[in-house]
A protein has these predicted regions:
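Post-HEXXH active-site segment of zinc metalloproteases
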Residues: 119-158
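Sec-dependent N-terminal signal peptides
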Residues: 5-13
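Active-site scaffold of zinc-dependent metalloenzymes
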Residues: 67-103, 109, 113, 119
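N-terminal signal peptide c-region/cleavage motif recognized by signal peptidases
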Residues: 15-21
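Zn2+-dependent metallopeptidase catalytic core
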Residues: 29-54
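Long, well-structured alpha-helical subdomains associated
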Residues: 147-158, 163-234
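Cleavable N-terminal signal peptides
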Residues: 7-8, 18, 141-143, 165
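Second-shell loop/turn segments in exported
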Residues: 27-33, 67, 92-104, 146-155
Length: 234
C-alpha cells in the first residue's frame, strides 16, 4: 500500500545519494528509473517555480519503507526514493493499471510536493487562520496525549497533500481524474484505522467532483478545500 512518510534527517545523512538529471543515471535501477520518469513532470514544475527540491536515492536496502517520501533539511525539500530491497516499490507499479500509471506516479509525486509547500511556507502542522484544533478526548492515557496530537497533525498534513495531488491531476490529466480519484480513495480505504495518520477520507471524498479543485493554482485549489475538510473533521 502506498503510504508516505516524512524522512528523518539522520536517515539521509547515513546513506543518501543526491541525483541530478544527466548524472548518475546509469547507477539507477529500472524501478527507480520508472518512478523518476513518472514523477518528472512534477519535478520539472517545481524547478519552473523555483521550489528548492532535490532528489535523493537511498542506495541501501530499504524494506518496508515508503518507496517515495519527503524530507526537509536546511530550507530545501528532498524527494526521497527508498526502493532497493523494497518489494513494495515494484509491487506498487504492478498494481496500477498500465494506462493509469503515468498519472498515478505524478499524483504521488505531487503529494510530496504538497508537503514541500507547507514546509517552505512555515506552515507545517499549522492551521488556517480562524481554525482551532479539536480538543483531545478526555479518556486518552496522559502518556499518549502528545503522540495522539502529533497523529492528528500528521493526518491534517496528509489530507492537504492528497488534495494537492488531486489538484495536479485535475489540471494535468482531467480526463483521467475520476479513475485516479478512485485509485486514491481505494488506497486510503485499505486497512483503514479511522482517525489515524493516513485517514484522509474526509478530504478525498470532498474532491470527488474535479470542479471543486478548479482554482488559479494547484496549491490555491488545495487550500480552499482543505479548510472545508477541517471544518467537517472538527
Amino acid at each position: 500500500m502506498w503510504k508516505t512518510v516524512v524522512v528523518c534527517f539522520a536517515m539521509l545523512v547515513r546513506a543518501g545519494t543526491c541525483f541530478a538529471a544527466g548524472s548518475a543515471a546509469a547507477d539507477l535501477t529500472d524501478t527507480e528509473t520508472r518512478w523518476l520518469k513518472g514523477a518528472w513532470p512534477v519535478i520539472a514544475f517545481a524547478k519552473s517555480q523555483a521550489i528548492p527540491l532535490d532528489i535523493v536515492v537511498q542506495p541501501q536496502s530499504a524494506p518496508g519503507i515508503a518507496p517515495i517520501s519527503l524530507a526537509y533539511i536546511s530550507g530545501r525539500c528532498k524527494l526521497v526514493l527508498s526502493m532497493r530491497g523494497n518489494v513494495e516499490a515494484r509491487a506498487t507499479l504492478e498494481r496500477i493499471e498500465p494506462d493509469l500509471l503515468a498519472a498515478t506516479l505524478e499524483l504521488m509525486a505531487a503529494h510530496e510536493l504538497g508537503h514541500c509547500r507547507r514546509y517552505l511556507d512555515g506552515a507545517w502542522n499549522g492551521l488556517p487562520a480562524g481554525f482551532v484544533a479539536a480538543a483531545l478526548p478526555d479518556d486518552i492515557n496522559p502518556a499518549l496525549r502528545l503522540s495522539y496530537s502529533d497523529m492528528k497533525a500528521t493526518r491534517r498534513e496528509e489530507g492537504y497533500a492528497d488534495l494537492v495531488a488531486l489538484a495536479w491531476t485535475q489540471q494535468h490529466h482531467p480526463s483521467l481524474y475520476p479513475r485516479v480519484h478512485a485509485w486514491l480513495l481505494a488506497e486510503r480505504s485499505k486497512d483503514l484505522i479511522p482517525g489515524s495518520h493516513h485517514d484522509t477520507l474526509v478530504w478525498v471524498q470532498l474532491a470527488k467532483d474535479a470542479t471543486t479543485l478548479v482554482q488559479s493554482s494547484t496549491f490555491a485549489s488545495s487550500t480552499a478545500l482543505w479548510a472545508a475538510g477541517l471544518a467537517l473533521d472538527n
